């Protein structure tokens, strides 16, 4: 994997910097590195493809070295270099796609394609110029079964989940109380509602709770907590739990009371925040517990009082909500991230070349299914293909 990264980094720099008019002295180190790459690759044959619709391609390396000059690089020099650069880039692209297309239930973090296995051989270790990539560093650690640490911004840690729980219900669905939520990506939105606005609740207060368990623990997380759940702030028709009917939800938004968020790790509370909104920090956690209250306003203007009558029918439904959004965090496991295109790149390659469903990844790389059942085998394979996708993205946009 380190060789693949070094090849890609060298080719990217060569493509960007070996241009007509450039002083040779400004790129002499790069050209020496480029020539070292050619010397190491010359005389070797590779084969890529042969899975799904990814065509079999054979690659032979027999290229001349780039020379030295005392002056600027001229058109002929650059043209000769370009021919070599384009062939190498095409090769790297196909090695990456071949690797992305493959998976294994055992030791899925190791190279799976014939070409990358060959590049991992001892004879190619001289191509090892720059391994500063976060993905390469963590791949090396994972390959040795040591602790990794990926920094994510808006990590897709929550599988998609949208549902409701009714704590009070009737066949007519005209006096309901409960919670509804939408968990997806890096965000949780949860709302507590009571059609009667807590008229018969103890002290006119309804208590709500929402617990979310993560598939992998996060550390040093920066989180935004807001006293609102905008996705549940407008009228909607909702299917009943048994699917036999539908019920009407017409929210009127109140501010939640006694808001508390707890971050737990292995059942132990690590951080707790009470009535604190905006930016909060969570040190280490695998579970989030949100609790909040709906309090019937003790004093109401006539207009507000008309919204929340003492008896049915209840045409407006008192609602309070919270939004919790993970802005950035560190995870020991690789994840999809809204700020990165790695999952999209991997999925696109597998779809474009009709890669058959294998023993590890779900059909279509369905992220909700993948993260819901995030096995060690999936984690290993995902780290490998994401590392390869990050390497490929240096050359192929």
From Swiss-Prot:
Gene3D superfamilies reported in the protein's UniProt record: 2.60.120.170, Viral capsid alpha domain
Subcellular location: Virion
Residues at which Ca(2+) binds: 266, 286
GO MF annotation: an example: host cell surface receptor binding
PTM note: The N-terminus is blocked.
Domain of life: Viruses
Keywords from the UniProt entry: Calcium, Capsid protein, Intermediate capsid protein, Metal-binding, Ubl conjugation, Virion, Zinc
Entry's Gene Ontology cellular component terms: viral envelope; viral intermediate capsid
Annotated binding of Zn(2+), by residue: 153
Annotated region (Interaction with the inner capsid protein VP2), positions in chain: 62-73
GO biological process annotation, one example: fusion of virus membrane with host plasma membrane
Chief site of localization: virion
Cross-referenced HAMAP family: Rota_VP6, Rota_VP6_A
Function, as annotated: Intermediate capsid protein that self assembles to form an icosahedral capsid with a T=13 symmetry, which consists of 230 trimers of VP6, with channels at each of its five-fold vertices. This capsid constitutes the middle concentric layer of the viral mature particle. The innermost VP2 capsid and the intermediate VP6 capsid remain intact following cell entry to protect the dsRNA from degradation and to prevent unfavorable antiviral responses in the host cell during all the replication cycle of the virus.
Subunit details: Homotrimer. Interacts with the inner capsid protein VP2. Interacts with the outer capsid glycoprotein VP7. Interacts with the outer capsid protein VP5*.
Family the entry assigns: Belongs to the rotavirus VP6 family.
Record's protein name: Intermediate capsid protein VP6
Organism ancestry: Viruses, Riboviria, Orthornavirae, Duplornaviricota, Resentoviricetes
